[in-house]
C-alpha cells in the first residue's frame, strides 16, 4: 500500500519563500559549495566584526574540530533586540499566556524587552557575573525566563537552563557539573493548576552545591518560601535599582552561548555546548525558512524553555527574525482539552509548532474540543520532539488544520541546534509520518552496522557526513566524551543515534533510537540514568530499563528490577520505586511498568542482553533471536511467564 502524499497547495508554491525549484538550487549550492553558501547566508545576522573565515571543520580524529565564522564577532542579544528597535520597537516581541485563562496575559514590546534585558544584565554584572561564567536558570515558562537568557547572552555569560520539572538531585548534578555559582528561580511554578515548589527544590539542591553564593528569586505566586539572608535576592526589587542601558559584549563566533544537559546512553547527562555565531545563523535561518516566517505573523512554539526547542524556537530564532512569539505557561488539557486552540483564537496564531505526545493526548479526548474553536487564523502547523505517527498526523491536518494547513514535521536534536530534516511548506509534498528532506547544508546518509553507506530505498543508521553551523561544539568539561559519543561509532561521520528509513523518493522516515535512549513524550531519557536511580535504592540489587510502545507518550519506560536477596517484592515496593525515581530524576522519568524478576538475562561474560529485554518490553516475544549465549535460559522463561498484562500490549 502506497503512503498518502499531500502535494504543495498552489498558493503556497506561488507565495512561499522557497518553492521546489529554489529548494533544489539552494540545497545543491549548500552541499556543493558550503563555503560560498554560508558566506552569503551567514550575513543574515548582524556582525560587529564581519567574518572572513567560513567553515573550518573535520569529523576525523587526526584533525577533529568544528569552527564556523571563527574570526567574526557579534552579540546574540543585540541580534534579538537592538537591531529591531528602530523599525519595530513598539511591536510585540512576546505574547505571554498564563497557566490559568482567568489570569491576564502579558504583551511585551521589543523596546520593553530590551529595557528588561539590560536591567537584568546589569544586575548579573552587579553580582560579579563575568563573561564565560555559567548561570543556572530553573524557571517556569514566564517572560522573565527569556529575559534571563538574553541577559546572559548580552554580557557573555553562559546559561544552563534546567527544566523546571527536574528534581532537586537532578538540578544539583547540573549545577555542580558546570560549576555555577548563581541560580535564577521562582518561588513556585504553575502548571495545569498545580503549584511546583521551585524555590524549595533549589534550597534542597543547594545542600549539595556549596559553591552557589547567589539565588535570584522571581515571585510568581507570592508563596511564603524560605529566604536565605545574604544569598537570596528578590528579583523585582533588585532589577528596579538597575539602569536600562547595558552595552552588549562583543563575542567571538566560537565563544560559548549555552549549555543544555541531555540524556545519553551512559549514566550522567551530558552538557551539550552551543557557541554564538553558528548557532545564531542556524536558529534564525531554520526558523524563517521552515515556518515560512514573515514579520508581523503571530508564531507559537508550544515547547518549554527547559528543552532545546524552547531555546531555538520560542526565544532565539523568532526574536532574531523580529517575530511575535507566544510563550505559554500551561498545559494542553487544563482547564480542558480545548486550551491550545482557545489560545490560537485569542492571539490569532498563524503558525503553531507542537509535540506529537500532546497531539495524541488531545486526539484521544475527541474532535469536539477542537471544533468548538475557530482556528481560522492558522496557516501552518509543525511537529517536533519525536516521529509523529501517520494517524496523529492525519488528525492534526484534518481536524486541527481543517485540511488546509501544511505540516512541517521536523527532525533534529539538542546536539544539532535546530531543524535538520524537514519539509519546507512551499516546496515539499508531504507524507504523513516522514520528516521528508534535509535542510540546506545538511548531508544525511544511511549506513549499516559496519559503517558501509547504503544507497537508494533502505533502512539503516542515520548519520550526517559533514558539519553545519548549528552543530554543538563539545560536551561541557569532557571533549573526549563528545568525540567518543558522536564520531567513533562510524569513523568520520556524526552518528545521530537514530534509525531511519529512506524511501524511493529520497524522503527520510525516523524509526527511533538505536542506542540506549528512550524518547518519552519527545524528551530523551537515558536508560542508564534511570537504572542508576533504581539501583541507588537500598532494596534493589540490579535494574535494566528499556522502552515500550505507549499510545500517548510514544515510548514508555519499562523497568526490570532484581531485589536484594532478603526482599520480597510487592506492589508497595513497586509504588515506592516509582516515587523514588521521580524524586531522583523528576516526573518525566516515571517508570510505566516495573517487572520484578529473580534475575536478568546475561551472557556468560556477565553482560545484560538488552535486546531480549527490549523484545519483552515491546511484547514482541515470538522471536527472541539467538539466545545461545545466555548463561541461564530459565531467567528469560521467568520474565516471559511473569510479564504484566498491559492494556493494548
UniProtKB/Swiss-Prot annotation:
Domain of life where this protein originates: Bacteria
Listed cofactors: Mg(2+)
InterPro entries referenced in this protein's UniProt entry, alphabetically: Ac_CoA_lig, ACAS_N, AMP-bd_C, AMP-bd_C_sf, AMP-binding_CS, AMP-dep_synth/lig_dom, ANL_N_sf
Binding site for ATP: 385-387, 409-414, 498, 513, 524
Family annotation (SUPFAM superfamilies): Acetyl-CoA synthetase-like (SSF56801)
Keywords: Acetylation, ATP-binding, Ligase, Magnesium, Metal-binding, Nucleotide-binding
Catalysed reaction, written as an equation: acetate + ATP + CoA = acetyl-CoA + AMP + diphosphate
E.C. no: 6.2.1.1
Binding residues annotated for Mg(2+), in chain numbering: 535, 537, 540
Family of this protein: Belongs to the ATP-dependent AMP-binding enzyme family.
Stated name of the protein: Acetyl-coenzyme A synthetase
Record organism: Novosphingobium aromaticivorans (strain ATCC 700278 / DSM 12444 / CCUG 56034 / CIP 105152 / NBRC 16084 / F199)
Species classification: Bacteria, Pseudomonadati, Pseudomonadota, Alphaproteobacteria, Sphingomonadales
Gene field: acsA
Amino acid at each position: 500500500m502506497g503512503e498518502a502524499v499531500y502535494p504543495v497547495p498552489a498558493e503556497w508554491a506561488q507565495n512561499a519563500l522557497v518553492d521546489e525549484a529554489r529548494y533544489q538550487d539552494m540545497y545543491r549550492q549548500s552541499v556543493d559549495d558550503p563555503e560560498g553558501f554560508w558566506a552569503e547566508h551567514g550575513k543574515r545576522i548582524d556582525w560587529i566584526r564581519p567574518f572572513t573565515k567560513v567553515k573550518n571543520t573535520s569529523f576525523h580524529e587526526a584533525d577533529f574540530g568544528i569552527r564556523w565564522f571563527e574570526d567574526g564577532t557579534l552579540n546574540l542579544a543585540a541580534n534579538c533586540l537592538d537591531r529591531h528597535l528602530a523599525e519595530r520597537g513598539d511591536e510585540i516581541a512576546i505574547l505571554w499566556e498564563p497557566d490559568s485563562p482567568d489570569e491576564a496575559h502579558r504583551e511585551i514590546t521589543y523596546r520593553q524587552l530590551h529595557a528588561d534585558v539590560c536591567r537584568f544584565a546589569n544586575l548579573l554584572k552587579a553580582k560579579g557575573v563575568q563573561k564565560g561564567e555559567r548561570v543556572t536558570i530553573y524557571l517556569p515558562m514566564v517572560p522573565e525566563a527569556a529575559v534571563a537568557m538574553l541577559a546572559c547572552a548580552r554580557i557573555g555569560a553562559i546559561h544552563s537552563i534546567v527544566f523546571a520539572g527536574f528534581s532537586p538531585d537532578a538540578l544539583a548534578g547540573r549545577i555542580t557539573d558546570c560549576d555555577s555559582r548563581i541560580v535564577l528561580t521562582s518561588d513556585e511554578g504553575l502548571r495545569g493548576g498545580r503549584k511546583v515548589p521551585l524555590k524549595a527544590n533549589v534550597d534542597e539542591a543547594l545542600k549539595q552545591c556549596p559553591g552557589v553564593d547567589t539565588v535570584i528569586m522571581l515571585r510568581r505566586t507570592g508563596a511564603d518560601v524560605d529566604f536565605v539572608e545574604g544569598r537570596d535576592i528578590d528579583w523585582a526589587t533588585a532589577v528596579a535599582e538597575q539602569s536600562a542601558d547595558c552595552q552588549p559584549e562583543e563575542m567571538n563566533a566560537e565563544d560559548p552561548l549555552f549549555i543544555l544537559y541531555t540524556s545519553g546512553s551512559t549514566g550522567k547527562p551530558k552538557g551539550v555546548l552551543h557557541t554564538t555565531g553558528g548557532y545564531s545563523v542556524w536558529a534564525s535561518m531554520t526558523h524563517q525558512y521552515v515556518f515560512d516566517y514573515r514579520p508581523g505573523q503571530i508564531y507559537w512554539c508550544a515547547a518549554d524553555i527547559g528543552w532545546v526547542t524552547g531555546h531555538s524556537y520560542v526565544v532565539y530564532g523568532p526574536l532574531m527574525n523580529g517575530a511575535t512569539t507566544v510563550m505559554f505557561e500551561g498545559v494542553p488539557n487544563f482547564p480542558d482539552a480545548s486550551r491550545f486552540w482557545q489560545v490560537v483564537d485569542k492571539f490569532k496564531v498563524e503558525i503553531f509548532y507542537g509535540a506529537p505526545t500532546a497531539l495524541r493526548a488531545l486526539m484521544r479526548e475527541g474532535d469536539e474540543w477542537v471544533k468548538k474553536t475557530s482556528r481560522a487564523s492558522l496557516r501552518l502547523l509543525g511537529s517536533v520532539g519525536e516521529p509523529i505517527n501517520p494517524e496523529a498526523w492525519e488528525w492534526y491536518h484534518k481536524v486541527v488544520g481543517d485540511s488546509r494547513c501544511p505540516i512541517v514535521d521536523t527532525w533534529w536534536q539538542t546536539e544539532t541546534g535546530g531543524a535538520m530534516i524537514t519539509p519546507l511548506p512551499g516546496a515539499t509534498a508531504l507524507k504523513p509520518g516522514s520528516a521528508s528532506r534535509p535542510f540546506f547544508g545538511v548531508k544525511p546518509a544511511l549506513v549499516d552496522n559496519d559503517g558501509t553507506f547504503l544507497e537508494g530505498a533502505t533502512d539503516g543508521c542515520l548519520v550526517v557526513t559533514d558539519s553545519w553551523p548549528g552543530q554543538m561544539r563539545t560536551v561541557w568539561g569532557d571533549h573526549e566524551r563528545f568525540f567518543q559519543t558522536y564520531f567513533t561509532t562510524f569513523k568520520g561521520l556524526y552518528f545521530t543515534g537514530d534509525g531511519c528509513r529512506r524511501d524511493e523518493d529520497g524522503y527520510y522516515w525516523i524509526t527511533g533510537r538505536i542506542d540506549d535512549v528512550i524518547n518519552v513524550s519527545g524528551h530523551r531519557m537515558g536508560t542508564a540514568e534511570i537504572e542508576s536511580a533504581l539501583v541507588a535504592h537500598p532494596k534493589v540489587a540490579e535494574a535494566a530499563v528499556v522502552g515500550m510502545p505507549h499510545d500517548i507518550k510514544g515510548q514508555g519506560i519499562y523497568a526490570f528490577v532484581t531485589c536484594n536477596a532478603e526482599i520480597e517484592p510487592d506492589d508497595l515496593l513497586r509504588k515506592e520505586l516509582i516515587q523514588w525515581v521521580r524524586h531522583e530524576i523528576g516526573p518525566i522519568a516515571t517508570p510505566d511498568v516495573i517487572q520484578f524478576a529473580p534475575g536478568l538475562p546475561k551472557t556468560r561474560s556477565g553482560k545484560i542482553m538488552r535486546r531480549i529485554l527490549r523484545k519483552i518490553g515491546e511484547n514482541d516475544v515470538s522471536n527472541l533471536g539467538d539466545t545461545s549465549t545466555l548463561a541461564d535460559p530459565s531467567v528469560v522463561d521467568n520474565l516471559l511467564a511473569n510479564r504484566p498484562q498491559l492494556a493494548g500490549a
